[in-house]
Design a protein with these regions (language model features):
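Short, acidic, small-residue-rich periplasmic hinge/interaction motif at the N-terminus
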Residues: 28, 39-44, 72-76, 86-140, ...
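Surface-exposed extracellular loop regions of Gram-negative outer-membrane beta-barrel proteins
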Residues: 385, 428-437, 442, 480-500, ...
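Outer membrane beta-barrel strand-and-loop segments of large Gram-negative receptors
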Residues: 403, 560-566, 572, 583-645, ...
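Signature of Gram-negative outer-membrane beta-barrel scaffolds
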Residues: 424-529, 542, 658-661
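Short loop/turn motifs that connect adjacent beta-strands in outer-membrane beta-barrel proteins
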Residues: 156, 214, 229-234, 254-257, ...
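Gram-negative outer-membrane beta-barrel transporters
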Residues: 593-596, 615-704, 796
Length: 799
């Protein structure tokens, strides 16, 4: 069936093609390397023109002859070029930003009316310049903290890099770093993300309307594009903050042929120790609210949380580093090789010595092998690992993947963009071992698992006429659980295995699944200023991140689909209205969505650690439902820029063996959230920014009380996620200053000073409820918060 669909895509596109020769290429920002979507290419003699797509690519069809091209984009200096066209040619353009014009234009890197005319719905695009307008956290511009401010996206807890998209779990978010999958995105237990802003040129978040070329997750895709090295001149930057120091280098190893980009960060332990002295902790408190949809009673959150507990991860015995690299080799005007890599590692003394980290690499060959055709071949490696030594015991776990992807892009004319391809990924899961270091064979070993996830896909972004644009795509995914390993049948009551079948070879298929995933989006242009959009997506997910605690931690494990754990299928419907005012200076949007989940997973009650022989038996699946409404008002241009967003959403699960088979709030359900962002560019070198966040507290499961046996307390529960943490809110303020006198004194070296005030009014947002034994041996609730007021400063030098 998929072959027929691909043939149909190609047939439709070919029938729409036109005769003539082509001028094609890519238009980018010369400084940042960011692809410029919506840049104009105009031929002055024939008055024919076109604009670039979201990846900065253009295609112009003309007969043989001499032509004069004018390449322009708002906020950039234009380029005039004369060409003689007697064959299909490729010309890439690099536009230089106009510093004066850039102050008053949208710095997103896309056309100002892209939100109106494109087929994208439930999609957010940000350039690194937009990200840098947000107040920094501990001296670091943070990609993950920034996307948590977007409509429909919230954080899982204070300071965490994990994020929730429309009520779904964080494992339902596919995170890509230049095409490399990332399985854990945090440093320092969530204070920092693994994305170094100096190494990022832009990002795209798909909350819905996910293109068919992406797959494997049910909720969203975060596609982060890493920075390319400058192919003409050397650039270097260094910076230092209270906690971290970092550097970046751009080097044209062979001018216009071979470039290198390298960036690194590391903790400065003395800075961490200093900050620990600034914040000595305060009382925590708050009220726990019963989730009215589930019944229950309120309760007070009592007790204190010490500064030492709150901020101990700043102690000098915790550190991290990461390195980003990218090498681009331009073989000729039609081919290039791209090598990207990432290495990151955390180490800490918490309960013994702990370390975790990511390693990833990608090799991509891009080839414009024929008229209107582009080929991308990628080989990708990614690994996440964690280990802990506590006393005489050693625990380790992780996941690693190796994949290959072949994609073809076909541009028959300016109204169609066709892509189709194939991808295959081998997955190796280490579910953990607990070893006794004093014994040769002592310990507990969890059997590893292996899987192969593959897919065929095809898609077309089709402008039908001046009013209607249609995106349509299909993805056919396959999953095979591979040997060696045991395939068990479990007793439904005890979860003990009652039958086992052993598969000895790596090529043995223990279980198989396939899913057909249609994707469609429609844009109807009501006028040049407003449009109506709708979309439908089906996404299959074969991996799940299983967590025992209320928060996602570095030691949580990824579980593949097996005979006993079915894949999750998510069907999402979205409808939106988009309106731009005053020549695209103000953008208003409103979207509503409805998601149906089949195969939603959660752990059964009674599991207290991962080191059990039959872990998959405790994974229960059922159905889920998420729906909501998002609205946003944005001003992306001018000296004052900002955004106001409000989200309403519900997310509930229903699993037969949990909560007596009744619907219950999913642990990442946050009913209301509000974000306000603002940036004042007071002068060309001085700006002030602020963010305010509010969200409903997330659901938690708490004991109703305790019963005592032989003087020992045993808790008892009634219902899953019956209560809620107190609501979350926070105000941050940032100041950015680039002294011009320093630039003059230092001969052109640019210095930027970032000052950030995190949590200005010192709100102690509770993220976890603990129980301590109080008076009369009774247990009391203690709300634990992490961060209070945190000032920080960072100095960056570019030369």
């Amino acid at each position: 069936m998929i072959k027929k669909i691909q043939i149909a895509f190609i047939f439709v596109s070919i029938t729409l093609s036109q005769d003539g020769l082509t001028i094609s290429g890519k238009i980018t920002d010369k400084v940042s390397g960011l692809a410029l979507a919506g840049a104009n290419v105009f031929e002055t003699t024939t008055e024919k023109g076109t604009s670039t797509n979201v990846e900065g690519e253009y295609l112009l069809l003309l007969p043989e002859g001499n032509y004069k091209l004018k390449v322009s984009y708002i906020g950039y200096n234009s380029i005039d070029s004369e060409v003689y066209l007697n064959k299909n040619i490729t010309i890439n353009f690099q536009l230089v930003p106009d510093p004066i014009a850039m102050r008053s234009i949208d710095v997103s890197g896309i056309a100002p009316d892209h939100n109106i005319k494109s087929t994208e719905i439930s999609v957010e695009r940000l350039s690194i310049r937009q990200v840098e307008q947000i107040p920094v956290v501990m001296g670091e511009t943070d990609i993950m903290k920034t996307i948590q401010l977007l409509p429909g996206i919230t954080s899982i807890a204070e300071g965490r890099s994990g994020y929730i998209v429309r009520g779904s779990g964080i494992d339902q978010n596919l995170i890509l770093m230049d095409g490399m999958p990332i399985y854990y995105s945090s440093h320092m237990q969530g204070l920092y993300s693994i994305f170094n802003s100096d190494a990022v040129k832009g990002l795209t978040v798909y909350k819905g309307g996910v293109p068919a070329r992406f797959g494997g997750r049910g909720a969203s895709v975060l596609d982060v594009q890493m920075r390319d090295g400058d192919i003409e001149q050397y650039r270097t930057s260094i910076s230092a903050g209270l906690i971290t120091s970092k550097f970046s280098i751009e080097a044209p190893l062979v001018k216009n042929k071979l470039s290198l980009f390298l960036a690194g960060r590391s903790t400065r332990l003395s800075g961490g120790s200093l900050y620990d002295k600034i914040n000595d902790g305060t009382q925590t408190g708050g009220r726990l609210n019963s989730d009215k949809g589930s019944g229950g009673k309120g309760d007070d959150s009592k007790g204190a949380s010490s500064g030492a507990d709150d901020f101990r991860f700043f102690a000098p015995n915790e550190s991290w580093y990461d390195i980003n690299g990218k090498v681009i080799y331009n073989i000729n005007e039609k081919q290039n090789l791209n090598l990207s890599f990432y290495i990151g590692r955390d180490s800490a003394y918490t309960v013994g010595f702990t370390e975790w980290g990511n390693r990833a690499a990608l090799l991509r060959w891009e080839n414009r092998f024929a008229n209107k055709w582009l080929s991308n071949t990628s080989i990708v490696y990614s690994k996440y690992y964690t280990a802990n030594i506590s006393g005489i015991y050693y625990f380790n776990s992780g996941v690693s993947t190796q994949s290959i992807k072949q994609e073809f892009s076909f541009f028959p004319n300016i109204n169609n963009e066709v892509r189709f391809g194939i991808t295959s990924e081998y997955q190796d899961f280490n579910h953990g071992s607990l070893e006794d270091a004093t014994l040769d064979d002592g310990g507990k070993f969890m059997p590893g698992m292996q899987g192969l996830e593959s897919a065929l896909y095809a898609e077309n972004d089709h402008k039908i006429n001046d009013k209607i644009s249609l995106y349509y795509g299909i993805r056919n995914s396959y999953y095979h659980q591979l040997g060696p390993g045991d395939r068990f049948t479990y007793d439904e009551v005890s979860n003990e295995p009652i039958q086992a079948e052993f598969f000895s070879e790596k090529s043995d298929v223990m279980s198989s699944y396939s899913s057909l995933e249609p994707r469609i989006a429609l844009t109807y242009l009501l006028s040049e200023q407003n449009s109506f959009k709708l979309s439908y997506n089906r996404n299959a997910q074969y991996l799940r991140l299983m967590s025992l605690g209320a928060e996602v931690e570095w030691y949580d494990i990824w579980m593949p689909t097996t005979k006993n754990i079915k894949p999750m299928l998510t069907d999402q419907f979205a409808v939106g209205y988009f309106h731009n005012f005053n020549n695209n200076e103000i953008k208003v949007s409103a979207e509503t969505y409805y998601k149906i989940l089949n195969g939603a997973a959660d752990f059964e009650d009674g599991l207290h650690n991962y080191l059990v022989d039959n872990l998959e038996a405790y994974v229960a699946t059922g159905e889920g439902l998420a729906y909501g409404f998002e609205t946003s008002v944005e001003k992306p241009t001018g000296k004052f820029t900002g955004r106001l967003s409000y989200n309403y959403g519900k997310s509930d699960y229903k699993i037969d063996v949990i909560n007596q088979g009744r619907w219950y709030p999913y642990r990442f359900d946050k009913t209301h959230s509000l974000t306000m962002l603002s940036n004042f560019q007071l002068t060309s070198n001085f700006s002030v920014s602020s963010t305010f966040l509010y969200s409903t507290g997330r659901p938690v499961t708490l004991p109703e009380g305790y019963y005592y046996i032989s003087g020992l307390p045993f808790p008892y529960w009634e219902g899953r996620n019956k209560y809620r943490l107190p609501d979350y809110h926070r105000l941050d303020i940032g100041i950015k200053y680039s002294p011009t006198f320093l630039k003059k004194w230092t001969g052109g070296i640019k210095t930027t000073i970032d000052v950030a005030l995190y949590n200005v009014y010192d709100r102690r947002n509770i993220h976890t409820i603990n129980y301590v034994q109080g008076e009369n041996s009774l247990f009391e609730q203690v709300g634990q918060s992490t961060y209070g007021f945190m000032p920080s400063i960072n100095i960056n030098i570019e030369f």
